[in-house]
A protein has these predicted regions:
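Compositionally biased Ser/Thr/Gly- and acidic/asparagine-rich
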Residues: 1-240
């Protein structure tokens, strides 16, 4: 489906599956987003996924690809045609020497001590000047879901392979972009015109306080105003 999924295990080091504290960070042509966090319900470390995938993938860094659009398509009335798959091509000219973050632009999703003092090549890094809106959703049960909405002239408001990242997890509570009735974590769109509306979906396991806020803005003009529209009450809430 055009998205890379990176497992980020950011707390509670254990080989016991139910003690895992982590989630899937994602990256595609629109950009990267860090993993969902739900740690406080498992232990009291309050750890969060903070690593955002970028242009470079570290040596030995594993990732998943997927042809599914929906993690759980049962009962979903999506009008997106299935992705039938194809070839994943890794070309030699994509290779570059780049140091791991924070000294470089490469992200490795496992904590390790730096063992090198070499200097990165840095010659192939592209400066991203596209506009991006990063939202953060806090659920009643403590899930923290980051979402990305980004502008790219090659994208549309419908599903675009490589620009829209489908939800790959089945969480008890979550928030996601709705594109043609399917769920996405990253959405690429052609513009941020003032008449644009981008549907959001919520999944909750109990009643309680829900927070939706702007986590970060990238290359967005200061005079742009953003609102959350409650579809049931038709009320608007300014969030910037």
């Amino acid at each position: 489906n055009g998205t890379l999924y990176f497992w980020d295990h950011f707390a509670a080091v254990s080989h016991v599956l139910r003690q895992y504290v982590g989630g899937y960070a994602m990256y595609n042509l629109t950009g990267g987003v860090n993993a969902i966090s739900d740690d406080y319900r498992i232990n009291n470390s309050f750890a969060k996924g903070t690593k955002v995938p970028s242009q470079y993938i570290s040596v030995a860094q594993g990732f998943f690809v997927n042809t599914e659009i929906e993690a759980d398509p049962r009962g979903v009335d999506s009008n997106i045609n299935p992705v039938v798959g194809g070839d994943v091509l890794l070309r030699n000219n994509q290779r570059v020497f780049e140091r791991d973050s924070p000294l470089g632009s490469s992200i490795f999703f496992k904590e390790a001590k730096a063992k090198t003092t070499a200097t990165s090549a840095g010659g192939n890094k592209k400066v991203d000047t596209r506009s991006k809106i990063r939202l953060l959703f806090d659920s009643p049960n403590g899930y923290h879901r980051p979402l990305l909405l980004g502008v790219d002239e090659r994208a549309t408001n419908n599903f675009d392979v490589g620009f829209d990242a489908p939800l790959a997890e089945k969480n008890n509570e979550d928030m996601f972009w709705l594109i043609q009735n399917a769920k996405f974590i990253i959405q690429g769109v052609p513009n941020f015109d003032k008449d644009q509306e981008f549907p959001l979906g919520l999944k909750l396991s109990k009643a309680g306080l829900v927070r939706i806020k702007i986590d970060a803005l990238e290359n967005v003009a200061n005079n742009v105003q953003m609102y959350i529209k409650d579809k049931s009450t038709l009320r608007f809430y300014k969030i910037n």
